[in-house]
Structure formats: C-alpha cells, structure tokens
C-alpha cells in the first residue's frame, strides 16, 4: 500500500523493485518509472538484500519493510525509508529514513517520517513506534523531536556502537 503525503508518494518495496534496486539505479528507475537520485541511499545494497530475503520468505510482511519515497513535483526517487519488519506481538515497530543530499533541509525527512508514523498508527496492532539515531544532535534527532518522539535511552548496538533510542506512543 502506498503512503501519500503532501509532496511525496512512498512506494512499498516489492520483490521486483528490490531486485531492481540491487541491480543498480538504471534498473530501479525503469522498474519504478521515475528518475532516481544517483545517491539516493548511503547504506548500499545489504539492507535491500535483507528485505528481499524477508519478503521472499513471506509476502505478508510487505508494507513493513523498505519504501521508496518519490518527490511528486520532480517525479524523482529521493531516498529510502521504511520499517524494520512487522509490529512485534506487543505492538512495537521501528522506522528509519534517509534523504539524498540535494533534497535535504527542505522538510522532506520530516514528511517521510511523519508518513511512516501515520501509516503505522493507523494499524490497530501498533502501540509504539521507535527509531534509533547516532548519539549526537543531528538532523534526524531534530526530525524525531519535531514529531514528539522522546529520547529514552542510550544503547550499544553490535553493528553501530552507541546509539540513542527514541519512542513515540500511540496517542
């Protein structure tokens, strides 16, 4: 299911789109039907391959992984975003997002995060949305604060080291 915001359409990553993204920007552009920012992701193909593996195991997880944010005026893929899987049994889901450099500082990161948040809270199972950031003030921490997330703790992630955990409970 697409998520639509004022300036964006967030297109869920299907197995076809994820396979195309892994093959390269030209393949992704053709599969999406939109121009692709050359530096739309800073994370490489590993997260896309992981998502593809999860969707291959069970298509019912679709809508709870990667989304491709399209800028509606420019008709261009400007980053990536999504969830780290379906809500847990106790109703928690994690969001993540990135915006390519040429589209930063325009409110689009906030718009992406808010779209993910609204979509998550529209699901009756979701009670809590979390996010993680580097342990310093940065654009992502500003976005989360703007959306009423609270920094709840500092944790040590096996891959990223020390990170901050943010939470927002369903209103």
Annotate each predicted stretch with a short phrase:
Residues 1-94, 99-102, 115-119, 123, ...:
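GNAT-family acyltransferases
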Residues 107-110:
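Glycine-rich acyl-CoA binding loop
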Residues 131-141:
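Conserved beta-strand-loop-alpha-helix junction that forms the acyl-donor binding cleft
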Residues 144:
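Conserved active-site tyrosine of GNAT-family acetyltransferases
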